[in-house]
Amino acid sequence: MPSQTPIITLTPELQVQLKEHTEGLLNNIIHTNLRTRFVQEFDGLRKFRDAFELLKDHSAHETWECYRDSVPLTNYSTYEPFISRFLAEPCREDDVKDILSPGLPFFIAKSSGTSGKAAKLFPKYRHFIGTAPSRNPTAAKGCHILSMTYLQVIDVLRNEGNSTKVVVTASSSGTVRMQHDLTIEKDAEVIKMTLPNTTSPIAVGHIRNYRSFLLMHALFALAEENLTFFYATYSTLFLDLIMFMEEEWATLLNSIENGIIPDFEDMHHVREYLEPKLLPNLSRAQKLREIGESKGESGWLFKIWPELQQVKCIVSGLFATTIPKIRHYLGPEVLINSRGMGASEGYIGESCSFTDLNLFKLATKEFIEYLDIMKDPSPANLVPAWEVETGRRYEVFLTTRDGLWRYRLEDIIEVAGFDSGDGIPLLRYVERLK
């Protein structure tokens, strides 16, 4: 969040600070991915390769100038011939190692196809922060609506004769797996566990039936009176959970009273792992029955969970239409917080305000450039973070740790100002490129 009141224009000192930071970020990304297959084989980077070899000291500023003048714009079709190597049968390590970033990806993110377009695949690699921070085991619990399912498992054959498994899954699921080092090889053991400070056992995340998946998250959340947060990818996911919970209210309360997992669809493969996790709780069930008399009223969820502090999910863009309904369910006491602005390709901005849910502070893990929407898409028209102007709208281009170079994201943002502490731009999501 902004350290102080946002400013409209960067001071000279903050502009220099932001420039040095951003150039350093780009320098690290380029030096990390310089020897990858994509950089060495993609003909569009030939000019960059030749120019980079002639640099004297490869300083951050020198690297930025080389990149600025020689790297073309790219889109998904640029990477598809390289990413498609993961789909070959057999998939051999020699063919896919160091494709976009060093080593093998931890998982491959599959974007959801929109506007009739086919879904896209993006290899995701483990970087310096590979595991999630430890949590206080005595802290209050929350419901993290998380799926652990995957769409495909790719067996990458190693030269030694063994293989490594790489899952194709949603970016949210893959990221949590990567943060907690939950490789698919560990699933048989991990499925018996519950992550720290979360209400739902990991086995719930292995339910593929959408309704059953959300109902089981609801069941374990209802059983926890001292619930403090809900985390969901999208606001619609949270609202669907509440809707299904209302529909199956009596069944869920009977399960809590008797400690019995309900017989919802497509749960046979996880039932044995869930049954030991739900203990009979007559008093909780009775209290919920009393609360159920006001089901659907404003603030109803706060009556169920009087310790609830926030619901965190994507509520910007098209999802902003869900905010009034969420606020009705929560009442005035509970905060609604945005999860940030991002895509399968990369993370753009961090949540910046509890009152303005479409305000984000530029994330500092990827190098982001901006194209004024009134200008033609060309490398010469891109500007870096230290040259954007408040009030202007830009199309976003990403150069990422996972190996994308000036990738056209087709998202439009508006610059809302700058953090007065470090000069980082503040952004608002506007729309997809039409």
Enumerate the predicted regions with their spans.
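Active-site glycine/GP-rich loop and adjacent strand/helix microenvironment
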Residues: 1-55, 59, 67, 92-93, ...
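Active-site diphosphate/adenylate-binding microenvironment
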Residues: 24-28, 38-108, 120, 130-132, ...
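Short, solvent-exposed loop/edge-beta patches enriched in aromatic
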Residues: 34-38, 91-92, 101-104, 113-117, ...
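Beta-propeller domains
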Residues: 100, 123-128, 138-139, 191, ...
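Conserved AMP-binding A3 loop
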Residues: 106-140
